[in-house]
Design a protein with these regions (language model features):
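N-terminal leader/targeting and pre-domain segments
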Residues: 1-343
């Protein structure tokens, strides 16, 4: 782990200072052992030292309520933007490649200049909840063996969180992403809960695998989203969700229930080539743009009570399971069943 100010690898001044060739005074920060070409320190002292370093950083990057009040109302403070950064929040922190062997608690942190957690390994719970990321946040290619907790956080700049392996549950409820977010090629081995979250920048969550339930209910996608090529082994829940931009969900496989009921699709939506193996529900949905469900396999599908202002196409789609419900629906933009069949 390293902290650094912009354009330099060394930051805080104080005891143990080193003088650079340019005459600047710098101090090296303690590093976490990564196991790459190094002799590991004594295991009886390494973990307590690492925990102490991490605890010290946490204390100094924690935000405080701007107008007082209890910290237990963290979500309310963050929603209002009423927080004051910690004394070290202006530094850049680089934890890349670190192995955390015990529970990590970095909740309620304010990362003002950037934080890099790429390539990290978390053996126990990683609690990064209720945090503010004012600059780019990097979490790529990390492995979480225990719970990963990101809920109630605010990402004000780009988020890089692709290629991760989540072996425990993921809690990312009520999180706000204000810039571009990359969650592609992730594997979620336990439940993933992203309910009531908001995305305002482009989201790329393509190529992900969800081994357990994936819950995106009541989310707001105020941007174009790419969720193409994903595999859902258990229920995929997108109920009461608002898609304000173009939604790319083509080529996905849903091996259990797929629930999109009461959602709103304001832009064009592409489900083409997707396979729905179990109950599929679009009950009460509002489709303002075009909807492409061509070349799909739909099992026990229901569009009951939905409205389509744009054209919808089922060209070459296979309907199976004996139940295909379109009752009380409105198709103002036309509907195309060319080459579709019920099996």
């Amino acid at each position: 782990m390293t902290t650094c100010a912009p354009h330099t690898r060394l930051s805080r001044r104080g005891r143990g200072e080193n003088r650079s060739s340019e005459g600047e005074t710098t101090e090296k920060e303690p590093s976490f052992y990564t196991g790459e070409g190094e002799t590991p320190p004594n295991s009886t002292t390494e973990t307590p030292l690492r925990q102490h370093i991490l605890g010290t950083i946490h204390q100094r990057v924690r935000w405080e309520p701007a107008f007082g009040g209890a910290r237990k109302n963290a979500a309310r403070h963050l929603e209002r933007g009423a927080v004051t950064p910690g004394p070290w929040s202006h530094l850049v922190f680089d934890f890349s490649g670190a192995e955390f062997r015990h529970t990590v608690n970095l909740s309620e942190s304010y990362w003002g200049a950037g934080a890099n957690f790429s390539g990290c390994s978390y053996r126990e719970t990683a609690n990064l909840s209720a945090s503010v990321y004012a600059a780019a946040a990097h979490f790529t290619a990390s492995t979480y063996y225990g719970k990963a907790i990101f809920r109630n956080s605010v990402y004000r700049a780009a988020v890089h969180m692709s290629g991760c392996d989540y072996r425990g549950q993921v809690h990312a409820q009520a999180t706000v992403y204000e810039a571009e977010t990359n969650l592609s090629e992730n594997t979620y081995r336990e439940g993933a809960d992203c309910t009531r979250s908001t995305w305002r920048g482009h989201l790329n969550a393509s190529g992900c695998t969800y081994r357990r339930a994936a819950n995106f209910a009541e989310c707001t996608w105020g941007c174009d989203v790419t969720l193409a090529g994903c595999t859902y082994e258990k229920d995929a829940v997108f109920m009461s969700t608002a898609f304000h931009g173009t939604a790319h969900m083509e080529g996905c496989t849903y091996r259990a229930g797929a629930y999109f009921s009461y959602s709103e699709f304001r832009g064009d939506t592409d489900f083409s080539g997707s396979v729905f193996r179990h109950d599929t529900e679009f009950v009460g949905c509002r489709w303002r743009g075009r909807a492409d469900l061509s070349g799909c396999t739909l099992h026990h599908v229901s569009f009951e009570g939905s409205s389509h202002l744009g054209a919808i196409t089922f060209r070459g789609t296979q309907f199976s399971g004996g139940r295909c419900v379109f009752d009380r629906s409105v198709y103002a933009g036309g509907i195309n069943f060319t080459g579709a069949a019920q099996t």
